Amino acid sequence: MIKIRDLEYYNNLKLDIYLPDSDTFDLLIYFHGGGLESGGKEEIIPSSDYLVERNIAIISINYRLYPFAKYPDFILDAVKGVKWCIENINKYGECKDIYIGGTSAGAYITQMLCFNSYYYKKENIDPLKIKGYIHDAGQPTVHFNVLKENGIDSRRIIINEDAPLYYVGIEKEYPRMLFIVSTNDLENRYEQTMLMLRTLKHFNYDESKIELKVMEGKHCEYVSKVIDNESVFGKIIYEFIKEKEP
């Protein structure tokens, strides 16, 4: 595995690259969690060996965080990162397919990118370049810290232009998607994930492209877990990318 750390992709923001030895690979672009106020690109490290050994390259991207960010800075940073990946990945080998994944706050970002095409259009990115999305325990309603920024009780469940759910039904089709949530997730996260899935069904999106994985335990605790020398989260990602293709 080749590791390239702390490459600047935009305005002093950094990313890390993990490359397999092969010249041809799939790519996972990853956004970390942390409530839009903490965390970092190193979050993917427990899964990196598992994925790279199976010929999946990873680019893990930092983005601006509260209190230095305001909505939608983190989404604008994320799409800049995606653009950098699309424009530069073939310098490191032949990239077959590109997937975007995120955990918790990172999955709020992945859902905003997936469902609100404004961000891709702003950067002249063709959404069809993205083969699939991994939305790991992300909030499909307005993120609780975006509510807090606006002086609203962070427990409120609000769907407006700041929520991924608001945009479902606008596009005619979406790429494949994997949603992950836990049985003992954050308060209301399981129910909100189910609402997202039912909304996609309500608009008659191809259910064969939508997968749900419910994990036993607490919010995202599987992300760093290793069982029998295998990364639990890495295996979930691998199976979605490599073994579940229609």
Model-derived features with residue positions:
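N-terminal cap/lid segment of alpha/beta-hydrolase-fold proteins
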Residues: M1-D23
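Short beta-strand element of the alpha/beta-hydrolase
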Residues: F25-G34
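Short amphipathic alpha-helix adjacent to the substrate-entry channel of hydrolases
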Residues: E42-I59
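Alpha/beta-hydrolase active-site loop
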Residues: K70-I89
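Primarily recognizes the serine-hydrolase "nucleophile elbow" in alpha/beta-hydrolase
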Residues: K83-K148
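The feature captures the conserved acid-bearing segment of alpha/beta-hydrolase catalytic domains
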Residues: P127, G132, G138-V146, I157-M194
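Active-site-adjacent alpha-helix of alpha/beta-hydrolase-fold enzymes
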Residues: G151-I157, T183-I210
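C-terminal catalytic histidine-bearing segment of alpha/beta-hydrolase fold enzymes
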Residues: F203-P246
